[in-house]
Design a protein with these regions (language model features):
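Assembly/oligomerization interface modules of large self-assembling protein complexes
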Residues: 14-87
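Long, contiguous amphipathic alpha-helices that act as assembly "spine/axial" helices in icosahedral shell
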Residues: 75-136, 171-172, 179, 220, ...
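Extended, solvent-exposed, turn-rich assembly/linker loops in the middle of proteins
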Residues: 135-206
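Sequence/fold signature of self-assembling virion shell proteins
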Residues: 2-12, 24, 39-51, 78, ...
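Short helix/loop capping segments that flank catalytic or ligand/cofactor-binding pockets
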Residues: 55, 101-102, 188-191, 271-273
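Cell-envelope/extracellular anchoring and linker segments
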Residues: 127, 137-143, 153-157, 267-268, ...
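Intrinsic-disorder-associated interaction segments
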Residues: 8-12, 22-26, 144, 148-155
Length: 286
């Protein structure tokens, strides 16, 4: 059926919606970040010190006397400023391919654009998490999770030590905690009897955004954004924030009779708010 005048605008709106839905389904790490909006190029945020506050001076929190002054407690934060980053990609489709190809070129182009942007953002999120210095620890696994000697494999111990380290820094990893693993380490976990026979282990009823199940109170999220020989524990909606300056947007640039460019972009930044709610396990692979 021939296109009518103005139909390209309708198609553009439809494609923009499709791209946004695709992106929401493909993200693995960004859904774990608290999302806030921004209308400035540079944003300032504050990293919080999680230390439990104690009274300063001669007064104590416990046992305040009649008509006595209250003790003073002071929370501290570190100020950080950074600029938003733009992520984007486009795909050129000839008029002939768009109209006459044996498969849906437009659909495959949209899928490729979305994957490239989502992958880039998720990789940037993981890089920001690993770059944070003041975490609850970066500790080598007792033995690789795929150790050739099966009896040496003990990922449950490594995971529990991570939970312990975060507890000791006043973050309860079992309230919204997430275990981030790459596909290799996920396979190692699923083949480990100490994991799958642990009373806390269960598979996900519905697999979405990389969520594969639970162990030790943590949600297991599988993603290629996690680098080799490494796993990480964070807390969903607490550890970090995704500050969005421009949400996922899409435009069609049409040259009638020649080609159509599908262009998508997003702009934002990752902000690590609670660095002590990060724990990294290294040496997970032999």
């Amino acid at each position: 059926m021939a296109d009518q005048v103005g139909q390209i605008d309708i198609r553009g709106e439809n494609i923009s919606s499709i791209v946004t839905v695709f992106a929401q389904k493909k993200f693995k790490l960004r859904p774990l970040l608290r999302s806030v909006s921004s209308n400035r190029l540079t944003e300032t945020y504050y990293k919080e010190d999680p230390t439990i506050l104690t009274a300063s001076g001669t007064r104590n929190i416990k046992g305040i006397g009649r008509l006595s002054e209250f003790p003073s407690v002071q929370r501290s934060w570190t100020k950080v400023s950074s600029e938003h980053i733009k992520y984007g990609a486009e795909s050129l489709i000839s008029m002939e391919d768009l109209r006459l190809n044996a498969f849906n070129v437009q659909s495959r182009a949209i899928n490729g654009i979305v994957e490239s942007i989502v992958n880039s953002i998720d990789i940037a999120i993981y890089a920001a998490l690993t770059a944070e210095a003041n975490t609850s620890g970066t500790v080598a696994a007792g033995n690789p999770w795929d150790d050739s000697t099966g009896t040496n494999q003990n990922p449950i111990n490594d995971i529990l030590r991570g939970i312990q380290a975060m507890d000791e820094n006043n973050y309860d990893a079992q309230e919204g905690g997430v275990l981030l693993v790459n596909p290799h380490d996920y396979a190692s976990l699923m083949q480990n009897s100490k994991v799958i026979n642990n009373p806390s282990f269960k598979t996900a009823d519905i697999v979405s955004n990389g969520r594969m199940g639970q162990v030790a109170g943590l949600t297991i999220v599988k993603t290629t954004s996690v680098v080799d020989d490494e796993a990480m524990i964070i807390i969903n909606q607490l550890t970090a924030t995704w500050q969005s300056a421009v949400g996922f947007e899409t435009a069609l640039i049409d040259k009638p009779g020649i080609s159509t460019i599908i262009r998508s972009w997003e702009m934002g930044q990752i902000q690590i708010i609670h660095p002590k709610s990060i724990y990294t396990i290294t040496n997970t692979e032999e």
